[in-house]
A protein has these predicted regions:
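Short solvent-exposed loop/turn micro-motifs enriched in small/polar/acidic residues
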Residues: 51-54, 132, 182, 353-356
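N-terminal beta-alpha lobe that positions the nucleotide/phosphoryl donor
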Residues: 38-42, 57, 76, 109, ...
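Peripheral (often C-terminal) accessory segments that flank ATP-dependent C-N-forming ligase machineries
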Residues: 1, 5-12, 365-366, 375-443
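Conserved N-proximal alpha/beta basic substrate-recognition cap immediately N-terminal to
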Residues: 93, 116-136, 143-291
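Short, flexible loop/turn elements at secondary-structure junctions
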Residues: 59-64, 74-76, 114, 168, ...
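Low-complexity, highly charged intrinsically disordered N-terminal segments
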Residues: 1-40, 50, 56-57, 63-65, ...
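Conserved metal-phosphate-binding beta-hairpin within the catalytic cores
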Residues: 51-76, 298, 345, 357-366, ...
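Phosphate-binding site of ATP-dependent enzymes
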Residues: 66, 272-294, 301-306, 312-395
């Protein structure tokens, strides 16, 4: 995840919603408040049919007239950005999540990303391990990086020490062999590594429970599969509440067989961009939105905000210069982009001081455990705020996403956060459906 600064305690605020056109959103938030018993009952019935991912984070965008998820991460890397006040929520949710997957588990091995230079990411691992330890687990951190050949203490952000131990495969189990601390044979393995570079042999065919499952990694997962599942969820939820599905659901298209270096697939991309922009214009006219429609073109597989661009015209993808093509051609781990998703762009009209803000909601099992705002002073309201090399300031949510004030204004802080929690849980449910559909054991 891109570098960030740690939450400052004096920032006890909620971003301003700087748009005059907030009628549709206030109506949506009011529908959620009025329908809260119905919504919570609906979620409970859904979780009887689907197993929630162990953990997830959802990036949302609030345009004042639309509130929608734009990305769902099944290997969240920002636990360091959550408010310490929500730790009890996290611990309770972690207890439930562990009990469901491995009820007898008391030892848990966390396998983080291989990179060890991002001190903020390392602090995320420290905080994640702390949550799980407080949930009653014996937790150690094991690395599958070839660079970690002996127990190594790294310094995480804030000077926090993090002990990484090399993982050893013994038969079909992963273990830590440590003369000083004793050997460690865990009941379950928690991946905080999104497998962008592929599934390493050391993780294949293990006896231990592996969470999330291997097919949740970006070597097999596709954003388009997720948003296809989200289409189904959003449609059913919108019928339940009697709202326009578009208010919570971004349109999307896909293009396969793209090669940005060779410039193959450009015509497909330009055509899909044009078609999507035309669809968005119709909805903008319906709701009186005067902003210019835009789409986001991004790699269908991958994370870290790489391989992403904002597009407002088909010509934007036909006239890419070499620098732009190079930027779009590869994602994390240097992998080539061959498939893209073209997603309706959702403006963010939330701001803090001089920065554009977008909410990120964190969940464990099917519980919302908190969240934060990415606040970016150098990007626009139509740009991706999660990008390599960018510096965003996390602003921890000061209110939980589970306790609306039904007597208050629809856009009062608890109610806005409740709406965030609802839409994030819709994306979580879509991820659960997606994982079930893509599970190789079900094929």
């Amino acid at each position: 995840m891109p570098q960030s600064t740690i939450v400052k305690e004096e920032k006890q605020m909620v971003p301003r919603l700087t748009t005059a056109l907030n009628g549709p959103l206030l109506s949506l938030e009011k529908s959620m408040l009025d329908g809260m018993p119905k919504i919570e009952h609906w979620f409970r019935t859904k979780w009887l049919d689907y197993s929630a991912p162990f953990y997830a984070s959802v990036d949302l965008r609030n345009a004042g007239f639309k509130l929608a998820p734009v990305d769902t991460n099944l290997f969240p890397g920002g636990f360091n950005n959550l408010s310490a006040e929500f730790l009890p929520l996290s611990v309770q949710a972690a207890m439930v999540a562990v009990e469901k997957i491995c009820p007898e588990a008391h030892r848990l091995l966390i396998i983080p990303e291989n990179h060890t230079r991002n001190t903020y990411y390392l602090r995320n691992v420290v905080e994640l391990a702390n949550i799980l330890r407080q949930a009653g687990m014996n937790v150690r951190i094991g690395s599958i990086s070839p660079e970690i050949t002996e127990p190594t203490i790294l310094e995480a952000q804030g000077g926090m020490p993090l002990l990484l131990e090399p993982v050893v495969r013994v038969g079909n189990r992963l273990k830590l062999l440590n003369k000083d601390l004793g050997d460690f044979d865990s009941c379950a393995i928690l991946l905080n590594n999104d497998l962008s570079a592929g599934i390493p042999d050391i993780l294949k065919n293990l006896e231990q429970d592996l969470i999330p499952p291997l097919h949740a990694g970006w070597s097999t997962r596709r954003k388009s599969q997720h948003f296809a599942a989200y289409n189904k969820v959003a449609q059913e939820f919108s019928e339940l509440l009697g709202i326009d599905e578009w208010l919570i659901n971004p349109y999307f298209e896909t293009c396969g067989e793209i090669d940005f270096h060779a410039r193959t697939g450009e015509d497909c991309l330009a055509l899909k961009v044009e078609q999507l922009l035309d669809k968005i214009k119709i909805k903008y006219a319906e709701y009186g939105v005067t902003q210019e429609p835009f789409v986001i073109v991004k790699a269908d597989a991958g994370t870290y905000g790489m391989g992403i661009m904002t597009v407002k015209s088909p010509d934007d993808v036909r006239d890419l210069n070499r620098k732009a093509r190079n930027k779009m051609a590869v994602v994390k781990e240097g992998l080539q982009v061959s498939e893209v998703i073209i997603q309706e762009g959702v403006y963010t009209f939330e701001s803090v001081d001089d920065g554009v803000a977008e909410p990120v909601v964190y969940m464990m099992d099917h519980f919302v455990i908190g969240g934060f705002y990415r606040v970016h002073t150098e990007r626009g309201m139509d740009e991706n705020l999660n990008a390599p090399g960018s510096h965003f300031s996390p602003l921890a949510f000061q209110k939980p996403c589970t306790l609306p004030d039904c007597a208050g204004d629809p856009d009062a802080a608890p109610n806005r956060f409740y709406a965030y929690g609802v839409v994030a849980r819709l994306a979580l449910l879509a991820a659960a459906m997606e994982l079930q559909e893509q599970d190789p054991l079900n094929s």
